[in-house]
Amino acid sequence: MSAFRTATIVLLTISAIAGKASAQMPSMQGSDQQPPGLPTTETMPPVMDNRIFGHVLFDQLEGRTDGRNVNFKWDGQAWLGTDYDKLWVKSEGSYQHDGKVDDGRTELLYDRAITTYFDLQGGIRSDIDSQPTRNWAAFGAQGLAPLFFDLEATGYISGQGHLAARIQASYDLLITQRLILQPEIEVNFYSKSDLGRRVGAGLSDIDAGLRLRYEITRKFAPYLGVAYSGKFGQTSNLARRADENTGDVRLVFGIRTWL
């Protein structure tokens, strides 16, 4: 089964789940028991649920240095749509000091709100960088978890039947209204090894960071921090055979901006 066909099935599944959730929502129509004096559906102003909005966020545009070399990393996303239905584009990757692009990931997703704080997402993912390209169907959820953690959990299936999963979580700790400390972690898993992309089955890699940003404006914030990147299990073994680092800690500097 191709990744495109699998993605189509995923999108249809999301639509069915979202439709069922909408059908189960309590009706907002007026009733005979409505208290006198409250506005009715005839007198209430029109709801803006169908207004189209757009948002672009570069969460990380940063350099990472170990004192000898500097790598550059990007992590951004954009969406366009209504309060309930959106089209998302997500992209991340790193430009290494030797000129190679690593860990490139781009996703195109349909997003449907299912609760106040969480959305279902489904679509396609392409791994495009200096290594062989891989395509996946994607299905997951994104939102604000209890204790105000931003959470993304996504599963993937390739046309060859390989499975993968990615979990990302972050938290904004306000020191002042403009000074914000953000811990973040991303974890990747794979069901089978892929020698072409040098990833092994099981827990593959972890990227974690602690960044302190200062919001000069709400739309522009420089930051400093520290980041850890590590490879584990079979992925770590593949890295050693290729004479690559299996983990390091680097100082980071960059900007966070949105529009």
Model segments located where?
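Repeated loop/turn-to-beta-strand initiation elements of outer-membrane beta-barrel proteins
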Residues: 84-89, 116-120, 147-151, 176-181, ...
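Solvent-exposed loop/turn segments connecting transmembrane beta-strands
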Residues: 64-72, 94-104, 126-136, 156-165, ...
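Outer-membrane beta-barrel initiation region
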Residues: 22-100, 104, 111-112
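Detector for outer-membrane/organellar transmembrane beta-barrel domains
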Residues: 133-195
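Residue-level signature of outer-membrane beta-barrel architecture
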Residues: 80-82, 112, 143, 157, ...
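Hydrophobic, lipid-facing positions within transmembrane beta-strands of outer-membrane proteins
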Residues: 54-56, 72-76, 104-108, 135-139, ...
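Transmembrane beta-barrel strands of outer-membrane/channel proteins
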Residues: 60, 89-93, 122-126, 153-157, ...
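Outer-membrane beta-barrel "beta-signal"
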Residues: 210-215, 245-259
